From Swiss-Prot:
Amino acids binding Mg(2+): E198
Record note on cofactor: Binds a dinuclear copper A center per subunit.
This protein's GO CC annotations: mitochondrial inner membrane
Organism (species): Drosophila subobscura (Fruit fly)
Transmembrane segments: 27-48, 63-82
Membrane topology field: Multi-pass membrane protein
Residues that hold Cu cation A2 according to the record: C196, E198, C200, H204
Protein name: Cytochrome c oxidase subunit 2
Cofactor: Cu cation
Subcellular location: Mitochondrion inner membrane
Source domain of life: Eukaryota
Role of this protein: Component of the cytochrome c oxidase, the last enzyme in the mitochondrial electron transport chain which drives oxidative phosphorylation. The respiratory chain contains 3 multisubunit complexes succinate dehydrogenase (complex II, CII), ubiquinol-cytochrome c oxidoreductase (cytochrome b-c1 complex, complex III, CIII) and cytochrome c oxidase (complex IV, CIV), that cooperate to transfer electrons derived from NADH and succinate to molecular oxygen, creating an electrochemical gradient over the inner membrane that drives transmembrane transport and the ATP synthase.
Length: 229
C-alpha cells in the first residue's frame, strides 16, 4: 500500500505491475536525458558570445532534429505497445471473481462456486480497530490464492465505477450494462489495498477494496468454510 511521503510507485505484487514499473523507469530515463540536453542547449544559447548573422539554414542539423525525435518516440512506443497487449491478454484462469460497483460499496461473487457472494463496505473510523487503516479497511475482504491466474469481471449497478488495485497493476472500469474483464497473477501473500478510481458521487472516497492473498491450501479451506456455513 502507499505510505506517507512515498514519491514512487507501490511495491509490485504481480508480474504485470513489475513490467509497468520497468516501463515507467525506461520512459522517465529518456525524459530526463531530453530535459538535460534541452536545458544545456538553452543555457549555452543565452550565455555564449558567438553570433552568425548569415546562418539562414542548416540541412544537416534539421535532418538530425527531425530523425532523432522519431527514433526516441519509437524507443518509447514499442515497449508501451507490448505492455498494452500484455495487459489485455486473458490467460486460462483458475478462478473467476465478479465485482459489482454500487453507490457506495462493492459486492463480489465467486463464479466457480455456488452461493459464495458478499458485500464489502468500508469500516467507519469509529468502528476501526487499532491496527486498521482509516478509509481503507473493509468488513469483508476478497480472499484469493497466490500463484494462480485470476480473472475478474467488473460491472456496476448504478453509475460508472472503477475497480483498482495499484500493487497488482489492475484498473478496470465498471459500467452499468457492460461486463469488462482482465486477469492478474498475485505472486506473494499479503494484503493489497485499492479504491474506486472513478468519481461516482458524494461518497466516492469511501468505497475501498482489500485483497487478502493466501496460499492455495488456505484458500481451499476458506472456500470450504464458506460453502458449509
Amino acid at each position: 500500500m502507499s505510505t506517507w511521503a512515498n514519491l514512487g510507485l507501490q511495491d509490485s505484487a504481480s508480474p504485470l505491475m513489475e513490467q509497468l514499473i520497468f516501463f515507467h523507469d525506461h520512459a522517465l530515463l529518456i525524459l530526463v536525458m531530453i530535459t538535460v540536453l534541452v536545458g544545456y542547449l538553452m543555457v549555452m544559447l543565452f550565455f555564449n558570445s558567438y553570433v552568425n548573422r548569415f546562418l539562414l539554414h542548416g540541412q544537416l542539423i534539421e535532418m538530425i532534429w527531425t530523425i532523432l525525435p522519431a527514433i526516441i518516440l519509437l524507443f518509447i512506443a514499442m515497449p508501451s505497445l507490448r505492455l498494452l497487449y500484455l495487459l489485455d491478454e486473458i490467460n486460462e484462469p483458475s478462478i473467476t471473481l465478479k465485482s459489482i460497483g454500487h453507490q457506495w460499496y462493492w459486492s463480489y461473487e465467486y463464479s466457480d462456486f455456488n452461493d459464495i457472494e458478499f458485500d464489502s463496505y468500508m469500516i467507519p473510523t469509529n468502528e476501526l480497530s487499532n491496527d486498521g487503516f482509516r478509509l481503507l479497511d473493509v468488513d469483508n475482504r476478497i480472499v484469493l490464492p497466490m500463484n494462480s491466474q485470476i480473472r475478474i469481471l467488473v460491472t456496476a449497478a448504478d453509475v460508472i465505477h472503477s475497480w483498482t488495485i495499484p500493487a497488482l497493476g489492475v484498473k478496470v472500469d465498471g459500467t452499468p450494462g457492460r461486463l469488462n474483464q482482465t486477469n492478474f497473477f498475485i505472486n506473494r501473500p499479503g494484503l493489497f489495498y485499492g479504491q474506486c478510481s472513478e468519481i461516482c458521487g458524494a461518497n466516492h472516497s469511501f468505497m475501498p477494496i482489500v485483497i487478502e492473498s493466501v496460499p492455495v491450501n488456505y484458500f481451499i479451506k476458506w472456500i470450504s468454510d464458506k460453502v458449509n456455513s
